Amino acid sequence: MGELGEHRSRSSLLSIPVLDTKTSGGSEYRESDGSLDLQSTLFEDHWLQSSQATTERNTDDPEEEIPPEEMVGEELPEVSNLEDSLRRDLEVEVVGMSHLSINERTTPTTSSAKCRKKKNHRLLELAKPKFNWQCLKDRTGRCCKGHVWISPRKTNLQFCLYWPSVYWTERFIEDTTLTITVPEVSRRVEELSRPKRFYQEYYNNNRTTPIWPIPRSTLEYQASNRLKRLATPKIRNNIWSINMSEVSQVSRAAQMAVPTPRTLRLAKPRAPATLLEEWDPMPKPKPYVSDYNRLLQLATPKALSEKCVPDRSPQWEVLNVTKNAVASSRIISLAQPKIRKDLNEGYNPYYISPASLVAQASPRIYELAVPKHITKKV
């Protein structure tokens, strides 16, 4: 890397007089143009050959990458040879183009070589066939319920689920070799995995022995004093058996205390709350009750005075015209009371109007008239 930095500094120093010659005149630049073009083409060809060699090495082994230190070390002698040749040409007749222009020309070639390298690497990746995850090979596998998935680069034993990206329609191949052992299940897990119904039918049927054996270490374990104290049930006091005279003992100071008038007033019981009628500020009128004696007084007819002379006598004679009068048919019909029928008297529930008898039913009405379910007679 140090040599590459020195090479860049030398090339920059060499490019300074070239810029002065460009400003001074263009005749010498035209004369040296042909020789510089030839050298630039040779430099580009040599550069392309080195880049193609590196790409061929990458295509042979795409996974191995050459470190940048080795690449720089291989290119440094070639660059030094080019620098010596340029010095000789500049001393003789070359005063046109600097090493900086050569670098400017070679920069697109380096970028194109990198792009070409990436494209080749990508094409090699795409050219590889997709891995069949269902093929049984001597590789690290994963087993789950009789099915196996092969992992090409996994070495740690973990239960991973690998879904195939292409073979969706194919069924998983059952692992008949049984290369991976299933972990052993303890009796405790088996008992816990059984359904609740099995427990109710089997273990609740007058069973005296425990479900699973108790280990000897548990039986021989000696409980500490703290555990024994915590295991002792608490003794709760029965409040109904306590003598209340002991609880409600009044101190001597309270017995000798003299209450204030305020305390005596507060000690008196409160008067009951007033009723709703008493709270109403507007008095309501009393309900009306008729006076029976007044009714009897009003019902008694007035007594006529002896000096009262009536207009006519309350008894008078009926005329002969009235006695011989004959009632007409209209008067007789009006004199008869109205005859009222009962609720259902004269009602015919099966009466059909003549318009309904003449009506024609539409196909939709026939469709709606068909019953949904026809019950068969037993």
Curated annotation (Swiss-Prot):
Residues in THEG repeats: 113-132, 179-198, 217-236, 253-272, 285-304, 321-340, 355-374
Compartment(s): Nucleus
Positions of the UniProt region annotated as Disordered: 1-35, 47-79
Acidic residues composition bias: residue spans: 61-77
Any one of the GO BP annotations: spermatogenesis
Keywords of this entry: Developmental protein, Differentiation, Nucleus, Phosphoprotein, Repeat, Spermatogenesis
Lineage top rank: taxon: Eukaryota
SMART domains reported in the protein's UniProt record: THEG (SM00705)
KW Membrane (keyword) present: no
Keyword hit for Ion transport: no
Phosphoserine modification, residue list: S290
One family name in Pfam for this protein: THEG
Biased composition range(s): Polar residues: 47-56
Major subcellular site: nucleus
One GO cellular component, as annotated: nucleus
Functional note: May be involved (but not essential) in spermatogenesis.
Subunit structure as annotated in this protein's UniProt entry: Interacts with CCT5.
Record protein name field: Sperm microtubule associated protein 2
Species of provenance: Rattus norvegicus
